[in-house]
Curated annotation (Swiss-Prot):
It is an enzyme of class 6 (ligase). Mg(2+) 4 binds at E834, N836. Mg(2+) 1 binds at Q284, E298. It catalyses: hydrogencarbonate + L-glutamine + 2 ATP + H2O = carbamoyl phosphate + L-glutamate + 2 ADP + phosphate + 2 H(+). Mn(2+) 2 binds at E298, N300. The large subunit is composed of 2 ATP-grasp domains that are involved in binding the 2 ATP molecules needed for carbamoyl phosphate synthesis. The N-terminal ATP-grasp domain (referred to as the carboxyphosphate synthetic component) catalyzes the ATP-dependent phosphorylation of hydrogencarbonate to carboxyphosphate and the subsequent nucleophilic attack by ammonia to form a carbamate intermediate. The keyword Nucleotide-binding applies. Its EC number is 6.3.4.16, 6.3.5.5. Mn(2+) 1 binds at Q284, E298. One of its GO terms (biological process) is L-arginine biosynthetic process. GO terms for cellular component: cytoplasm. It comes from Pelotomaculum thermopropionicum (strain DSM 13744 / JCM 10971 / SI). This is Carbamoyl phosphate synthase large chain.
């Protein structure tokens, strides 16, 4: 069928901020789809609230709206833009839910907007648990015994009938949100109560547990002519009972017989046909280990995390094909861009193995419940490709960046037999390492299989790696050639082989070269080499034949940022992609290394060459030796890439941008202090300490409170405000591993206004596109603060000082590329808090709101362009006539036992932006986009520490004036009553009944005695997170929210506005567009 000519304009809904369960895969999918639609001559209108995405760049769609993802906001955009069609299936669960609401509210019908891709009825049948169950039974597909419940009482009745355990699955939710496995009545009451609240329609599916069965996924495609194909089948190493986003996944499946494979493939195709999905669809099955019995667990009628993995695993561009199907094309009409010859109706074939391992945030949250179940907890994932399962597994493990290069965790040898058995029996993030430890202790295969319910195939492979390590240990410092080749084929890195044999890693490398054991690079081509591929997408393996053709063009290697984790998110992938575009603008061949299957940087057509590899010194050097680039760019890959700088430089690799000495001077505390003193720039007083005694001495001299943190970290990991000697000793002995090589920094804590600057340097001078002011005072991590552009409360003198200090620091460090500096402003004084000689998470926001393509400009500066050549003058850039507010987004409800109060260690998983002509309007949009829903009236509960009571009085007065009823804990209530406010006293010894009552609209709580689990304040905050009641732990945020509520009450809600409209009114339209052919992108 030819493309439909009646579809001229399409509205695409993005997925919003990165949260657990919905990450960068939707930026990749949305970007690919927007480009595909425009290739077909369709005008694209995009709405998304996430400024850190490539898809919200001005040249990805014809009109870009960075607005809250709520049905009424999208309805206003529909009224303005009048699209012919709406494509919601690229926006994750958020996009589907909005589409359903728009239809139910009559918006789509009123404006004649057609839902493209998957019909509304199909979405409802897949998402509504009862309709889905009925459809499966109609077509003869088996589903576990289940019931639909709208109350806790109904859940208890069903569980009483079929027995425990039971699985709770809320309708219309993401990443298993609110779900879980209940093994007893009390657990069911808690899980079902939470799940009902989190479901958009107040409905949960209660089903018999098939935990322990094998979990298999099929990614399938269907077009409007009912042509269907299977793109990829994937096998979860972990059994049913663990969310697939928290499972190790292998593609293609390794343990299915052909009969089982075909049985489930046929079922997947029957299901996509019955649902009438047009586009991509993910089907999940539970397969009995001992028979051919299976159940259908779930269907996602949209692009998903699994489809991103399937797409990167096979090279098949699922999102692109889905977008073209949505406008009428069929699979046999859509050319596969990977081969340039075959069509999308050809099923991909794989001649390699892909392994995905989730990246969990437990290194950030030591107190979190690490048990894995049906509710997802991972923030991101890594993917690895090799010719063997072992090779792919070991690559994936070292891609995680968790301080290990193999299957042995530091400290695992010290686990008792009982601890080890517990780690094997109860799924958790350490189970892979526990399996290796069990085999290391010569536990039997049968025993490990019974405890884990993991297939013998995978266990035998892990045991094989452990036995190989023993052979290497026995071989000594010169292992024989065949043993070394076997070790490299199984994915063991030189560093691990070196430790086992007693050789330094460089000597292992030299021995490999002597033996002729070198990696070969293979191409991902979707067709197992049946057709020649035209897209350069490679992986390494220890094989004789190499498939990479190295060009004679000048080339530069960009290091990506690896898996998404707290502190290092999608912002750095945005920067990596823009760096690639900057290189291409200059006619340089752009080569990128990354291992994250969710991102735009690992899409088949982003860079000139993509290497899907771990970001370790050995793996990066393999690519450098192959490609021989002019230099390597490390600035845009977050701490992942920065940490490789010294090792690469020591081996003679040319690091482009800021000199290594400049990076070291900024990161090394003592060197940096001397630099600032020499420049006459004040900073918060502090010292480094290499042991507990030194830290105590520094803290005593400075006076408490002090801010402590390790050096060379990102996202404020292990950073804390310490108020006493006892807290300091606890921190030094438990939170960090301090040593002369890894000192701890101890600073005097200044509680002023925090300000953030990003600047572009050419090695001599700096251009500052903009300054951002934080709403929360210093002490809250910049990634968790609400930030405003341009600053709203700084004086001219303070801004001038910030600009002066930034220029001085940049010149002294010879910044070439990007630099991020954080300041604290206190009583007119400006103090340097931190300097990062690299891209920061605010770069995408500033690029979008100033119109300055910061990363492209920085990349071109690294290639020798001066600021003048790029069209910039040193100093601060002009300020536009609108306000932008960046707000953090958290995923606390997914992580049990995690403290939600804000501090110097970053906790947010994503961010949103609000943009408007007024500050209250922009702040309202940002808060709404972040999911802060506060009723226009009702109860506000105050419970604040003694130090905050005086300030809380005025804030409580503002909420009272807005008509809210004040409630407070006894101590806080006394302070409010003393100020003449009417307040009702509440006790929070057990906060669950209060919050579960549904009468509390907002909680304002500041911690008193640290963050101790079990204390009433901690329980109040945790319960609020789990029941989605807004809980603010910063009085600055509470005051800002009161201002927003007042503004909306008197002035109404601000209207949506497109980015192009804002820039046109400023006379700067299109100044941040990407153009490959000229300098017009910058002038």
């Amino acid at each position: 069928m030819p493309r439909r000519k009646d579809i001229r304009k399409v509205l695409v809904i993005g997925s919003g901020p990165i949260i657990i369960g919905q990450a960068a895969e939707f930026d990749y999918a949305g970007t690919q789809a927007c480009k595909a639609l425009r290739e077909e001559g369709v005008s694209v209108v995009l709405v998304n609230s996430n400024p850190a995405t490539i898809m919200t760049d001005l040249d990805i769609a014809d009109q870009v709206y960075i607005e809250p993802l709520a049905w009424d906001s999208v309805a206003e955009i529909i009224a303005r833009e009048r699209p012919d069609g709406l494509l919601p299936t690229l926006g994750g669960q958020t996009g589907l839910n909005i589409a359903v609401e728009l239809s139910e509210k009559g918006v789509l019908q009123d404006y004649g907007v057609e839902l493209l891709g998957t019909p509304l009825e199909s979405i409802k049948k897949a998402e509504n648990r009862e309709l889905f169950k009925n459809l499966m039974l109609e077509i003869g597909e088996p589903v576990p015994r289940s019931t639909i419940a709208g109350s806790v009482e109904e859940c208890l009745a069903f569980a009483g009938e079929i027995g425990y355990p039971v699985i709770v699955r809320p309708a219309y939710t993401l990443g298993g949100t609110g779900g879980g496995i209940a093994c007893r009545e009390q657990e069911l009451v808690e899980i079902a109560g939470r799940g009902l609240k989190m479901s958009m329609i107040g409905q949960v599916l209660l089903e018999q547990s098939v935990a322990g069965w094998k979990e298999i996924e099929y990614e399938v495609m269907r077009d409007g002519a009912d042509n269907c194909i299977t793109v990829c089948n994937m096998e979860n190493v972990d059994p049913v009972g663990i969310h697939t986003g928290d499972s190790i996944v292998v593609a293609p499946s390794q343990t299915l017989s052909d009969k089982e494979y075909q049985l489930l493939r046929s079922a997947a195709l029957r299901i996509i046909r019955a649902l009438k999905v047009e586009g991509g669809c993910n089907v999940q099955f539970a397969l009995d280990l001992n028979s051919m019995a299976y159940y259908v667990i779930e269907v996602n009628p949209r692009v998903s995390r699994s489809s991103a993995l399937a797409s990167k695993a096979t090279g098949y561009p699922i999102a692109k094909v889905a977008a073209k199907i949505a406008v009428g094309l069929t699979l046999d009409e859509i050319k596969n861009p990977v081969t340039g010859k075959t069509y999308a109706c050809f099923e991909p074939a794989l001649d390699y193995v892909v392994v995905k391992i989730p990246r969990w945030p437990f290194d950030k949250f030591g107190s979190a419940d690490r048990t894995l179940g049906t509710q997802m907890k991972a923030t991101g994932e890594v993917m690895a490709i090799d010719r063997t399962f072992e090779g792919a597994l070991m690559k994936a493990v070292r891609s995680l960046e968790i301080g290990v290069d193999g299957l042995h965790l530091p400290g695992s040898a010290g686990w008792s037999e009982m601890e080890l058995e517990e780690k094997l029996s109860y799924p958790n993030d350490l189970r892979l390492f526990a399996i290796a430890e069990a085999f290391n202790r010569s536990w039997g295969m049968r025993e490990v299989a019974q405890l884990t319910t993991i297939d013998y195939f995978y266990l035998s492979k892990i045991r094989g790696i452990v036995e190989l390590e023993r052979e290497l240990q026995a071989a000594g410092p010169r292992p024989p050639r065949e043993l070394l080749r076997r070790a490299k084929s199984c994915g063991l890195p030189d560093s691990l082989i070196g430790r086992l044999t007693g050789l330094p890693a460089r000597e292992v490398h030299a021995l490999r070269k002597e033996y002729g054991i070198l990696p070969a690079f293979k191409i991902v081509d979707t067709c197992a080499a049946e057709f020649e591929a035209v897209t350069p997408y490679y992986y390494s393996t220890y094989d004789d034949e190499d498939e990479v053709a190295v060009s004679g063009r000048p080339k530069v290697l960009v290091l990506g940022s690896g898996p998404i984790r707290i502190g290092q998110g999608i912002e750095f992938d945005y920067c990596s992609v823009h760096s690639v575009w900057g290189l291409q603008q200059e006619g340089i061949e752009a080569v990128i290394i990354n291992n994250n299957p969710e991102t735009v940087s690992t899409d088949f057509d982003t860079a000139d060459k993509l290497y899907f590899e771990p970001l370790t010194l050995e793996d990066v050097l393999n690519v450098i030796e192959k490609e021989k680039p002019l230099g390597v760019i490390v600035q845009f890959g977050g701490q992942t890439a920065i940490n490789l700088t010294a090792g690469l430089a020591a081996l003679g690799v040319n690091i482009l941008g800021t000199p290594v000495e400049g990076i070291d001077a900024a990161e090394d505390r003592d060197k940096f202090e001397k630099l600032l003193t020499g420049l006459g720039i004040p900073q918060s007083e502090g010292r480094s300490a290499v042991n507990v005694e030194e830290a105590q001495a520094v803290a005593e001299k400075l006076g408490y409170p002090v801010l402590v943190r390790p050096s060379y970290v990102l996202g404020g990991r292990a950073m804390e405000i310490i108020s006493s000697k006892t807290e300091l000793v606890k921190y030094m002995t438990e939170a960090v591993q301090v040593s002369p090589r890894h000192p701890v920094l101890v600073d005097k804590y200044i509680r002023g206004k925090e300000v953030e600057v990003d600047a572009i340097g050419d090695g001599n001078d700096l251009f500052i596109p903009g300054i951002m002011e934080h709403i929360e005072r210093a002490g809250v991590h910049s990634g968790d603060s609400i930030a405003v552009y341009p600053p709203q409360t700084l004086s001219r003198e303070e801004i001038d000082k910030i600009v002066e200090y930034t220029l001085k620091i940049g010149r002294a460090l010879k910044i070439n590329g990007l630099i991020n500096i954080q300041y604290v402003v206190d009583n007119g004084g400006v103090y340097v808090l931190e300097v990062n000689p690299r891209a920061s998470r605010t770069v995408p926001v500033l690029s979008k709101v100033t119109g300055v393509p910061m990363v492209q400009a920085a990349t071109r500066a690294m290639l020798g362009r001066s600021l003048a050549e790029l069209g910039y003058r040193p100093g601060l850039g002009p300020v536009g006539g609108f306000i932008a507010v960046k707000a953090p987004v958290f995923s606390f409800e997914k992580l049990g036992l995690v403290e939600i109060s804000l501090g110097p260690e970053m906790k947010s998983t994503g961010e949103v932006m609000g943009i408007d002509r007024s500050f209250p309007g922009a702040l309202y949009k940002a808060m709404r986009a972040a999911g802060l829903k506060v009723a226009s009236g009702g109860r506000v509960v105050f419970s604040v520490a003694d130090r905050d009571k005086a300030e809380a009085v005025s804030i409580a007065g503002e909420y009272a004036a807005l008509g809210y009823t004040l409630h407070a804990t006894p101590g806080t209530a006394r302070a409010l009553e003393k100020a003449g406010l009417e307040v009702e006293v509440v006790e929070i010894t057990d906060p669950v009944p209060l919050i579960r009552s549904g009468t509390v609209g907002l909680i304002i709580n500041t911690p008193t005695r640290g963050k101790v689990p079990g204390r009433p304040g901690f329980l109040l905050r945790r319960t609020a997170a789990e029941y989605r009641v807004p809980c603010l732990t910063s009085l600055d945020t509470a005051r800002a929210l009161a201002m927003v509520l007042r503004s909306v009450r008197w002035g109404g809600e601000p209207a949506p506005v497109s980015m192009a409209e804002l820039f046109e009114k400023e006379g700067t339209a299109n100044c941040c567009l990407r153009k490959k052919d000229s300098k017009a992108a910058i002038f």
